[in-house]
Amino acid sequence: MRKAEISRKTAETDISVTVDLDGTGRYDIRTGVGFFDHMMDQLARHALIDITLRCEGDLHIDDHHTVEDCGIALGQALTRALGDKRGIRRYGSFHLAMDDALVRAALDLSGRPFLVWNLPFPTEKIGSFDTELVREFFQAFATHGGITLHVDLIHGVNSHHIAEAAFKAVARSLREAVEPDPRRADAIPSTKGML
């Protein structure tokens, strides 16, 4: 069973997250940050990973701790659900078009966290949401999920479309990478023998 549950409590946030890598993309996200919830819905739906996420954060300060800490907890849950990563495809990539926006994502569930980020936003905010928090989320998610992640904007003029295309592109890449590979049923996808 490729499922995991993580609880994470700090002075800034109180988070619980469950993931099912063999789900259908069901989601129940409540962080108190509307735009971020919308993006997390997209991540779950397009990765076909069931995600339940609850966060009580210090939103009276700003959204930063909530968004970053959700990335940490989700990355930890992914790591736990993958176990030793036996039988997975490991790699995934996807080009995602959404109206004016075209985003490319590529990732490796290598256990070596690294983020390459080339996703400039034309505005500093999407409604009240700081666009810089998109990178903060993916940095935390990649670090705590042990993911090498590249996200590149190929074209885009609308910040909402760019952000949504990024979440969907990463989701589709993740969907490919966590999927069981029938040709490697019980094999670790590395010549090292471990990830």
Swiss-Prot record:
Record pathway: Amino-acid biosynthesis; L-histidine biosynthesis; L-histidine from 5-phospho-alpha-D-ribose 1-diphosphate: step 6/9
GO cellular component: cytoplasm
S-S bridge residues: none
GO terms (BP aspect): L-histidine biosynthetic process
A Pfam family this chain is assigned to: IGPD
Cited PROSITE patterns: IGP_DEHYDRATASE_1 (PS00954), IGP_DEHYDRATASE_2 (PS00955)
Catalytic activity field: D-erythro-1-(imidazol-4-yl)glycerol 3-phosphate = 3-(imidazol-4-yl)-2-oxopropyl phosphate + H2O
Enzyme class: lyase
The EC number(s) this enzyme carries: 4.2.1.19
InterPro entries from the UniProt entry: IGPD_sf (IPR038494), ImidazoleglycerolP_deHydtase (IPR000807), ImidazoleglycerP_deHydtase_CS (IPR020565), Ribosomal_Su5_D2-typ_SF (IPR020568)
Localisation: Cytoplasm
Keywords associated with the record: Amino-acid biosynthesis, Cytoplasm, Histidine biosynthesis, Lyase
Main location (coarse class): cytoplasm
Molecular-function GO terms, alphabetical: imidazoleglycerol-phosphate dehydratase activity
Similarity comment: Belongs to the imidazoleglycerol-phosphate dehydratase family.
UniProt cross-references to NCBIfam families, sorted A to Z: PRK00951.1-1, PRK00951.1-5, PRK00951.2-1, PRK00951.2-4
Protein known as: Imidazoleglycerol-phosphate dehydratase
Organism of derivation: Cereibacter sphaeroides (strain ATCC 17029 / ATH 2.4.9) (Rhodobacter sphaeroides)
